[in-house]
Amino acid sequence: MNFRDNSNIEYRKLDAPLKFINKNYITIGDKDREKYSKILADILEAFRRKMAESDEVYKTFEGAVHYTGSAYDKVKVGKPDEFDLNIVMKLPAAWDYHNDIEVKNSSPSYVTINVKSGCERSYRDPSFLNKYQKGIRIWTDNEGYFIQEQFHAWMEGVVKKALNKFPSHGLEYIIQTNGHAIYVKTKKSGPAVTLQCESQDRKIKIDVDLVPVIQFNNNSSTLWLSPPVRQRPLLCCKKTWCAVPKPKKNNGFTNKNREWRVSFTDQERDLLYNKGRIKNLIRQIKKLKSVHEETKSLPSYYVKTIFLWALDDKSLDQNMWTQWSDGALFMFMLKRLHSHLDENKIPYYWDSRCNLLDALGYAVNNMKYKIQRIIKEIDNSLDNPEVLAKYLLTADEFADFRRRYGSIEEGFESLSIDSAPPVSDLRGDSRCCIL
């Protein structure tokens, strides 16, 4: 059934339960956000100070900490207890991006970085040999290429040296923040070093992923990658982008350790800014996928990417994010997710040669059929809010919904079909259909 054959008015029946679910089970409260953010800031301040004390190379190249991920995009579901932080390393300010640094596209969504020319032109900064040479030597091979494995191993060493400056108890390190003790352990996860933090009473737990990155466009000269990497959208005022030491398996590239994943988190934040209810929608789809075993392994970034492509779709009326009803938007994007799974394709937004779903293998089929069943049942039960709730909530949350929603449903009378404001016709593209 094609999505645009559905009645726009019918999907408004989902508005009230969606608003209730958003408020009670998805949206993070301001108090929780402030509490966890304050704890994170205290941990980070103490930890970065020890990192700078522990390693001269880190102190020399240290840039700002770049907050990334769901928590700071405001699309996090549940407690704000997981944070992604880019630990930015800035290249020498005297280097010119066009003459001293050679960045080339390699495998889809990856680049190589060569700084041999910059090292040879060190006369631009008389103190270069003393100030920068040690770090450059640690991070590069004998041909001047940055090597992600060396860079990542170096950062792990910095983290370990910094932690060793704190008191320890067993396998945990103790960071004192404003009179409170935070117990910290570490683990490796992809390109990140994760700090697993707990309060002394074990009531608060926070995971902090520290990802070391090399930042570009942080000085007077600028460098953007050549096609097929997407050029910087006009809406994006920020020019900085990062190279991430993220390993890529089976890419056929001879020197894969020279490859770095490109990351454009600043631009993605610009693209999602002030786009109506789009962040609510991202949270809803993420909530749904997190509840079901078949879809749990779909990374949240892939969900975000689907929305970036929808914003880029010229066949859509982009006023939809403010004019359509909550129910219509939710079902449209759920069906769009199904279309991507059905085609087994979610292209990386910045380099469409890279299909993100390739990393998931056969799990995509299970996801596709699960989403298809959910769509069919919701479409057939628009008058029953419990069907929608069943697919968006955990068992305990659903039991709570059943107890509470019926007694307050009258409070949503202002959202009834007759009183709801007119909404634009649903115009999905031809891909958004369920077969």
Curated annotation (Swiss-Prot):
It catalyses: GTP + ATP = 2',3'-cGAMP + 2 diphosphate; GTP + ATP = pppGp(2'-5')A + diphosphate; pppGp(2'-5')A = 2',3'-cGAMP + diphosphate. InterPro entries: Mab-21-like_nuc_Trfase, Mab-21_HhH/H2TH-like, MAB21L/cGLR. ATP binds at residues 70, 82-84, 286, 300-304. Its cofactor is Mg(2+); Mn(2+). Coiled coil: none annotated. Mn(2+) binds at residues 311-312, 317. GTP binds at residue 209. Mg(2+) binds at residues 82, 84, 209. Gene3D superfamilies: 1.10.1410.40, 3.30.460.90. GO terms for molecular function: 2',3'-cyclic GMP-AMP synthase activity; ATP binding; GTP binding; metal ion binding. It is an enzyme of class 2 (transferase). It holds the Pfam family Mab-21_C. Its EC number is 2.7.7.86. GO terms for biological process: innate immune response. Keywords: ATP-binding, GTP-binding, Immunity, Innate immunity, Magnesium, Manganese, Metal-binding, Nucleotide-binding, Nucleotidyltransferase, Transferase, Zinc. Belongs to the mab-21 family. Nucleotidyltransferase that catalyzes the formation of cyclic GMP-AMP (2',3'-cGAMP) from ATP and GTP and plays a key role in innate immunity. Directly binds some unknown ligand, activating the nucleotidyltransferase activity, leading to synthesis of 2',3'-cGAMP, a second messenger that binds to and activates Sting, thereby triggering the immune response via activation of the NF-kappa-B transcription factor. This is Cyclic GMP-AMP synthase-like receptor. The lineage of its organism: Eukaryota, Metazoa, Ecdysozoa, Arthropoda, Hexapoda. The gene is cGLR.
